[in-house]
Swiss-Prot record:
Disulfides per UniProt: none
A molecular-function term among this protein's GO annotations: hydrolase activity
UniProt entry tagged with the keyword Hydrolase: yes
Gene3D superfamilies documented for this protein: Ribonuclease Z/Hydroxyacylglutathione hydrolase-like
InterPro entries the UniProt entry points to: Metallo-B-lactamas, RibonucZ/Hydroxyglut_hydro, UPF0173, UPF0173_UPF0282_UlaG_hydrolase
Full protein name: UPF0173 metal-dependent hydrolase SAB1566c
Organism: Staphylococcus aureus (strain bovine RF122 / ET3-1)
Similarity remark: Belongs to the UPF0173 family.
Length: 229
Protein backbone atom coordinates (compact mmCIF):
# COMPACT_ATOMS: atom_id res chain seq x y z
CA UNK A 1 0.00 0.00 0.00
CA UNK A 2 1.17 3.50 -0.84
CA UNK A 3 -0.04 6.79 0.68
CA UNK A 4 0.95 10.02 -1.05
CA UNK A 5 0.50 13.63 0.08
CA UNK A 6 -0.41 16.28 -2.49
CA UNK A 7 -0.80 19.50 -0.55
CA UNK A 8 -3.44 20.79 1.88
CA UNK A 9 -5.47 17.65 2.78
CA UNK A 10 -5.26 15.77 -0.51
CA UNK A 11 -4.14 12.17 0.02
CA UNK A 12 -3.76 9.53 -2.70
CA UNK A 13 -4.09 5.93 -1.52
CA UNK A 14 -3.08 2.95 -3.64
CA UNK A 15 -4.07 -0.46 -2.28
CA UNK A 16 -5.58 -3.73 -3.47
CA UNK A 17 -4.99 -2.58 -7.05
CA UNK A 18 -7.31 0.41 -6.58
CA UNK A 19 -6.66 4.15 -6.44
CA UNK A 20 -8.42 6.37 -3.90
CA UNK A 21 -8.11 10.14 -3.47
CA UNK A 22 -9.21 12.06 -0.38
CA UNK A 23 -10.29 15.71 -0.72
CA UNK A 24 -9.12 16.35 -4.31
CA UNK A 25 -8.13 20.04 -4.14
CA UNK A 26 -6.00 20.10 -7.28
CA UNK A 27 -6.60 22.85 -9.86
CA UNK A 28 -6.49 25.90 -7.58
CA UNK A 29 -4.15 24.44 -4.98
CA UNK A 30 -0.78 26.24 -5.11
CA UNK A 31 0.87 23.33 -3.28
CA UNK A 32 -0.57 20.46 -5.33
CA UNK A 33 1.70 18.62 -7.75
CA UNK A 34 -1.08 16.68 -9.50
CA UNK A 35 -2.60 17.43 -12.91
CA UNK A 36 -6.39 17.12 -13.08
CA UNK A 37 -6.09 15.92 -16.69
CA UNK A 38 -3.94 12.91 -15.84
CA UNK A 39 -5.12 11.81 -12.38
CA UNK A 40 -6.46 8.26 -12.41
CA UNK A 41 -8.75 7.28 -9.56
CA UNK A 42 -11.37 4.66 -8.71
CA UNK A 43 -12.78 6.32 -5.59
CA UNK A 44 -13.02 9.85 -4.23
CA UNK A 45 -13.62 10.33 -0.49
CA UNK A 46 -14.67 13.71 0.90
CA UNK A 47 -14.33 14.93 4.48
CA UNK A 48 -16.52 18.02 4.06
CA UNK A 49 -17.77 20.63 1.62
CA UNK A 50 -15.31 23.53 1.87
CA UNK A 51 -13.68 24.54 -1.42
CA UNK A 52 -10.20 23.37 -0.40
CA UNK A 53 -11.52 19.83 0.12
CA UNK A 54 -14.52 19.58 -2.24
CA UNK A 55 -12.15 20.98 -4.86
CA UNK A 56 -12.24 19.21 -8.21
CA UNK A 57 -14.61 16.42 -7.21
CA UNK A 58 -17.20 17.06 -9.94
CA UNK A 59 -14.75 17.23 -12.83
CA UNK A 60 -12.69 14.32 -11.53
CA UNK A 61 -15.73 12.09 -10.91
CA UNK A 62 -17.14 12.74 -14.38
CA UNK A 63 -13.77 12.29 -16.09
CA UNK A 64 -12.87 9.02 -14.37
CA UNK A 65 -16.25 7.52 -13.44
CA UNK A 66 -14.98 7.20 -9.87
CA UNK A 67 -17.39 6.51 -7.03
CA UNK A 68 -17.66 9.49 -4.68
CA UNK A 69 -17.95 8.59 -0.98
CA UNK A 70 -19.16 11.39 1.26
CA UNK A 71 -21.87 12.50 3.65
CA UNK A 72 -25.42 11.66 2.60
CA UNK A 73 -25.99 15.36 1.91
CA UNK A 74 -22.90 15.65 -0.29
CA UNK A 75 -23.84 12.52 -2.21
CA UNK A 76 -27.36 13.87 -2.85
CA UNK A 77 -26.00 17.28 -3.87
CA UNK A 78 -23.47 15.84 -6.31
CA UNK A 79 -26.04 13.54 -7.86
CA UNK A 80 -28.95 15.99 -8.05
CA UNK A 81 -27.18 19.24 -8.94
CA UNK A 82 -24.07 18.10 -10.78
CA UNK A 83 -25.12 14.84 -12.41
CA UNK A 84 -22.41 12.76 -10.77
CA UNK A 85 -23.52 9.19 -11.44
CA UNK A 86 -21.61 7.11 -8.91
CA UNK A 87 -22.11 8.30 -5.34
CA UNK A 88 -22.15 6.52 -1.98
CA UNK A 89 -23.61 8.48 0.91
CA UNK A 90 -22.66 7.69 4.51
CA UNK A 91 -22.87 9.27 7.93
CA UNK A 92 -20.90 9.37 11.18
CA UNK A 93 -20.62 5.93 12.77
CA UNK A 94 -21.28 4.12 9.50
CA UNK A 95 -18.86 1.70 7.87
CA UNK A 96 -18.95 0.39 4.32
CA UNK A 97 -16.85 -2.18 2.50
CA UNK A 98 -15.44 -1.58 -0.96
CA UNK A 99 -13.13 -3.58 -3.20
CA UNK A 100 -10.08 -1.65 -1.93
CA UNK A 101 -10.96 -2.00 1.78
CA UNK A 102 -13.37 -0.40 4.24
CA UNK A 103 -14.33 3.18 5.07
CA UNK A 104 -15.74 4.30 8.41
CA UNK A 105 -16.92 7.84 9.05
CA UNK A 106 -16.09 9.29 12.46
CA UNK A 107 -16.59 12.62 14.15
CA UNK A 108 -14.74 15.83 13.34
CA UNK A 109 -15.32 19.27 14.86
CA UNK A 110 -15.52 21.75 12.02
CA UNK A 111 -18.17 23.05 9.58
CA UNK A 112 -19.23 22.00 6.09
CA UNK A 113 -20.78 23.98 3.26
CA UNK A 114 -20.18 24.84 -0.38
CA UNK A 115 -20.71 28.33 -1.76
CA UNK A 116 -22.42 28.62 -5.15
CA UNK A 117 -21.40 31.17 -7.77
CA UNK A 118 -24.31 33.33 -6.54
CA UNK A 119 -22.68 33.50 -3.12
CA UNK A 120 -25.29 31.37 -1.36
CA UNK A 121 -23.81 28.60 0.84
CA UNK A 122 -25.25 25.09 0.63
CA UNK A 123 -25.23 22.90 3.74
CA UNK A 124 -23.44 19.64 2.98
CA UNK A 125 -23.86 17.65 6.16
CA UNK A 126 -21.57 17.15 9.12
CA UNK A 127 -17.79 17.25 8.63
CA UNK A 128 -16.18 13.87 9.12
CA UNK A 129 -12.96 12.06 9.82
CA UNK A 130 -12.20 8.84 7.95
CA UNK A 131 -10.91 5.51 9.19
CA UNK A 132 -9.65 3.36 6.31
CA UNK A 133 -8.80 -0.31 6.69
CA UNK A 134 -6.76 -1.40 3.68
CA UNK A 135 -4.46 -4.40 3.31
CA UNK A 136 -4.47 -5.01 7.05
CA UNK A 137 -3.49 -1.42 7.90
CA UNK A 138 -5.55 1.32 9.56
CA UNK A 139 -5.32 4.89 8.28
CA UNK A 140 -7.02 7.73 10.16
CA UNK A 141 -7.54 10.96 8.22
CA UNK A 142 -8.91 13.29 10.88
CA UNK A 143 -10.33 15.76 8.38
CA UNK A 144 -10.42 19.41 9.35
CA UNK A 145 -11.02 19.40 13.09
CA UNK A 146 -10.35 20.87 16.47
CA UNK A 147 -9.03 18.81 19.34
CA UNK A 148 -11.51 16.46 21.02
CA UNK A 149 -10.99 13.72 23.57
CA UNK A 150 -12.99 11.07 21.71
CA UNK A 151 -10.07 10.78 19.33
CA UNK A 152 -8.82 8.35 21.97
CA UNK A 153 -11.99 6.27 21.59
CA UNK A 154 -11.57 6.20 17.82
CA UNK A 155 -7.97 5.01 18.23
CA UNK A 156 -8.96 2.48 20.89
CA UNK A 157 -11.55 0.96 18.57
CA UNK A 158 -9.23 1.18 15.56
CA UNK A 159 -5.52 1.19 16.51
CA UNK A 160 -3.95 3.55 14.00
CA UNK A 161 -1.00 2.78 11.76
CA UNK A 162 -0.93 6.12 9.93
CA UNK A 163 -2.64 9.35 10.99
CA UNK A 164 -3.02 12.41 8.76
CA UNK A 165 -3.57 15.38 11.06
CA UNK A 166 -4.00 19.12 10.36
CA UNK A 167 -1.54 21.55 11.95
CA UNK A 168 -2.37 24.83 10.20
CA UNK A 169 -4.24 26.54 13.06
CA UNK A 170 -6.85 29.30 12.50
CA UNK A 171 -9.33 26.92 10.80
CA UNK A 172 -8.19 23.64 12.44
CA UNK A 173 -5.89 22.46 15.18
CA UNK A 174 -2.52 24.13 15.35
CA UNK A 175 0.74 22.46 16.28
CA UNK A 176 0.08 22.45 20.04
CA UNK A 177 -3.32 20.75 19.83
CA UNK A 178 -2.32 18.46 16.96
CA UNK A 179 0.74 17.17 18.79
CA UNK A 180 -1.35 16.71 21.95
CA UNK A 181 -3.89 14.71 19.93
CA UNK A 182 -1.13 12.45 18.62
CA UNK A 183 0.69 12.03 21.94
CA UNK A 184 -2.30 11.59 24.24
CA UNK A 185 -5.22 10.33 22.17
CA UNK A 186 -4.36 8.74 18.81
CA UNK A 187 -0.84 7.35 19.35
CA UNK A 188 -0.30 6.13 15.78
CA UNK A 189 2.75 4.36 14.45
CA UNK A 190 3.22 7.14 11.88
CA UNK A 191 1.92 10.73 11.92
CA UNK A 192 1.80 12.94 8.83
CA UNK A 193 1.05 16.67 9.23
CA UNK A 194 -1.33 18.17 6.66
CA UNK A 195 -3.43 21.31 6.06
CA UNK A 196 -0.64 23.87 6.39
CA UNK A 197 1.36 26.33 4.23
CA UNK A 198 -1.23 26.40 1.44
CA UNK A 199 -2.31 29.95 2.34
CA UNK A 200 -0.74 32.68 4.52
CA UNK A 201 -3.25 32.15 7.35
CA UNK A 202 -2.10 28.56 7.87
CA UNK A 203 1.67 28.86 7.46
CA UNK A 204 3.43 26.58 9.94
CA UNK A 205 6.79 24.89 10.46
CA UNK A 206 6.09 21.13 10.42
CA UNK A 207 9.43 20.49 12.15
CA UNK A 208 7.96 22.07 15.27
CA UNK A 209 5.16 19.50 15.13
CA UNK A 210 7.69 16.70 14.70
CA UNK A 211 9.71 17.96 17.65
CA UNK A 212 6.58 18.06 19.83
CA UNK A 213 5.45 14.50 19.05
CA UNK A 214 6.84 11.79 21.33
CA UNK A 215 5.07 8.69 20.03
CA UNK A 216 5.74 6.75 16.85
CA UNK A 217 7.37 8.28 13.80
CA UNK A 218 6.56 11.62 12.15
CA UNK A 219 6.87 11.80 8.38
CA UNK A 220 6.96 15.34 6.95
CA UNK A 221 5.97 14.83 3.33
CA UNK A 222 6.43 17.33 0.54
CA UNK A 223 3.73 17.28 -2.16
CA UNK A 224 4.26 14.13 -4.20
CA UNK A 225 6.11 12.24 -1.48
CA UNK A 226 4.71 9.07 0.03
CA UNK A 227 4.68 6.53 2.83
CA UNK A 228 4.77 2.93 1.65
CA UNK A 229 4.10 -0.38 3.41
Amino acid sequence: MKLSFHGQSTIYLEGNNKKVIVDPFISNNPKCDLNIETVQVDYIVLTHGHFDHFGDVVELAKKTGATVIGSAEMADYLSSYHGVENVHGMNIGGKANFDFGSVKFVQAFHSSSFTHENGIPVYLGMPIGIVFEVEGKTIYHTGDTGLFSDMSLIAKRHPVDVCFVPIGDNFTMGIDDASYAINEFIKPKISVPIHYDTFPLIEQDPQQFKDAVNVGDVQILKPGESVQF
